[in-house]
Amino acid sequence: MRLEPDNVGDLGQDRSVSTGNTAADTDTQSMTGAGTREADTASERVPSGAVREEYENLVEEVRKHRFAYYQEDAPIISDAEFDELFRRLETIEAMHPELVANDSPTQEVGGEVSAAFAAVEHLQRMYSLEDVFSLEELESWIAKAEASVAKLGNGTAGPAWLTELKIDGLAVNLLYRDGKLVRAATRGDGYTGEDITHNVLTIKEIPQQLTGGNYPAEMEVRGEVFIPSKAFAEYNEALIEAGKAPLANPRNAAAGSLRQKDPAETAKRPLRMYVHGIGAREGLRTVSQSDTYRQLAEWGLPTSPYFEVLGSLKDILDFIKRYGDKRHSLTHEIDGIVVKVDDFATQRALGYTSRVPRWAVAYKYPPEEVHTKLLDIAVNVGRTGRVTPFGIMEPVKVAGSTVGMATLHNQDVVKAKGVKIGDIVVLRKAGDVIPEIVGPVLALRDQQDPPVRDFVMPTECPACGTPLAPGKEGDVDIRCPNSRSCPAQLRERVFHVASRGAFDIEALGWEAAIALTQPAEPVTPPLTSEANLFRLTREDLADVRIRREKRSKGVATGEFELVPYFYTKGTAKSPSKPTATTEKLFTELEKAKSQPLWRVLVALSIRHVGPRASRALATAFGSMDAIREASEEELAHVDGVGPVIAAALKEWFAEDWHREIVDTWAEDGVRMEDEQDESTPRTLEGLTVVVTGSLEGFSRDEAKEAILIRGGKASGSVSKNTSYVVAGENAGTKLDKAEQLGVPVLDEDGFRALLANGPAASADSADASADDDDAGVGDRPEDHQEEPAE
């Protein structure tokens, strides 16, 4: 799997390519291990430079991990590790609220929307759920919720709790009009998701027309798409038989299936869906979650059979134990238990925080643990030169799949865990996904033959022989400083260039990156710098060979052979020629040249610079030259950039060979500036505008572009810093929040006036929009209930 800026091969997946490099490389040092602190009077303190830098690093790291999870479908850290980062971020914000921006990860749900799919706005926000990782935390949460219910004063003895399995899949929002399925979207950031309608239509059990009657004229149905465990195993067996790499795990496979560009490919995947709630609706009144499940089933929608309405904490704990004992024998993977207040009136009274409902929680099971032998500890060199040790183990089945490798992060982690080569170790899958070595079984250490031995971190890069050193004084990470010429770093950068968040070159995958930079033959690889990527020719690839493991009836034999990668083998009757994938590679390379500026910035592998910062930079400066020439202060002033990213940009452009990449790409036709219409007035300079609902004359992207080219910021969330909210048809919770905060609300005519002539011209429209509130602008039935995505 891969972190957004960096790549890692999935540690539990047999790639059948011998490279010796499979573990992780991350750009930013984890901020784990920081304890929480009370925030009573701390909000009055002025943050020091160190606190501000830690905060900015945390924000960027959380964003990177979200990108890896939601867009790459490839998390690199466990849920628990992510939560530790997130809680540290929340602690700093509680102590220093002046640091909090409205686009902070703590104010958002989920991830950004991929540019590969059309963006669509949910009629009502899709919330996430608060996670707890121990029974003690769960008991505390329920006690707090029951105390809040008691304060409502409605005479209720205590809430009934709908308790159900938390499916490990991808949250999806279905939109039905007059009973007909018209749209399907991913959760995205909770407000806006990706349009995956054509792919969802391939899931046979999702009705395209609801059965029965009494369904609302318009209704959002929320649920989870997943792949059943047995079907996943059978699908992987078929892939192996066909000589293809198996999929890593059911959750990533489901998410990746829904993001296929070709629905015919999605149709081959054994996808299923369970629905668990309703978002926006017109004219439907259900009184409880369990009542809603009954109604959804009557309409022909697939609901989970694994739920119960329970009346006490003891019953909930019994439910958790019962399914915990058999979670790996269920029909599908789960990553916990969801507990919700069943009654909708009580849910509405309890309300929401900025991210999660106060009436629902997700309990995460502790990871399953097994024993296996640690055969060796090797190291991987990542995209930024970070050298990461990883354990090579006797393959063992854990949490539903066979694992043979696990990251050990850095040499300090190896020492802290106390593991030695040859030990019997405790292995688990953190979050039931990421393989993790917990520690040694000390009682068995003296019985090992040969005797165990200490791991010694290499002093030279295993890929290029350069002496290794810490990136900076006191840094626990050891790095290879030979960024330009190290073939391992180049391999990772080339793979990153092709990633979905950068140039999106589907034909340049992990194995292709190896073939281009570290082939078995020829001695001089086709690529010695990413600068020459767009100068590759078919002739350059004709003699490339890689080492690939032989298979017998789909089973790896342990023997390797040299095979051509980019060309067919060729026979006397059929000469060798470029494969279809190779032809696709050249087509996609040509197409990549016209990608927008922000994608080019992501492709450059500049530390800390992900899609969000790249978009902000492209919007603010418009061209690569302008970004290169900007001062550090000018860069830091851009909303969404800040001093850490600004310093990283200046440091990157200071290197001659970095500038050579940009210059060479530009010579080869890569787009280095976004088209700017100089005749468009900058009427929205310094303004933040939020668009919600459907506008007759603008698509969502057109409205956003209209704001950006006039100097404004198009935001996805409403806060006290929002200048205007533009409300179209089916405006959702953003309109409610705007009214609560007193933010001016514009209709479409007011929006056009704002675009044309600025704030003064829109004032009358805002007043008129406010006067129209009683006429039903943005009205919704009282019983609208926003369903969190599980």
Curated annotation (Swiss-Prot):
Keyword Transmembrane recorded: no
Reaction(s) catalysed by this chain's protein: NAD(+) + (deoxyribonucleotide)n-3'-hydroxyl + 5'-phospho-(deoxyribonucleotide)m = (deoxyribonucleotide)n+m + AMP + beta-nicotinamide D-nucleotide
GO biological process: DNA repair; DNA replication
This protein's UniProt keywords: DNA damage, DNA repair, DNA replication, Ligase, Magnesium, Manganese, Metal-binding, NAD, Zinc
Catalytic residues of the enzyme: 166 (n6-amp-lysine intermediate)
Pfam families associated with the record: BRCT, DNA_ligase_aden, DNA_ligase_OB, DNA_ligase_ZBD, HHH_2, Nlig-Ia
PROSITE patterns reported for this sequence: BRCT, DNA_LIGASE_N1, DNA_LIGASE_N2
Binding site for Zn(2+): 461, 464, 480, 486
Matching SUPFAM superfamilies: BRCT domain, DNA ligase/mRNA capping enzyme, catalytic domain, Nucleic acid-binding proteins, RuvA domain 2-like
Biased composition, class Basic and acidic residues, residue ranges: 777-790
Renumbered residue ranges of the record's region Disordered: 1-49, 757-790
Cofactors demanded by this protein: Mg(2+); Mn(2+)
Superkingdom of the organism of origin: Bacteria
Bias-annotated ranges (Polar residues): 15-33
Enzyme class: ligase
Residue ranges of every copy of the BRCT domain listed in the record: 679-768
GO cellular-component term (any): cytosol
Function text: DNA ligase that catalyzes the formation of phosphodiester linkages between 5'-phosphoryl and 3'-hydroxyl groups in double-stranded DNA using NAD as a coenzyme and as the energy source for the reaction. It is essential for DNA replication and repair of damaged DNA.
Family: Belongs to the NAD-dependent DNA ligase family. LigA subfamily.
Protein name: DNA ligase
Native source species: Arthrobacter sp. (strain FB24)
Record lineage: Bacteria, Bacillati, Actinomycetota, Actinomycetes, Micrococcales
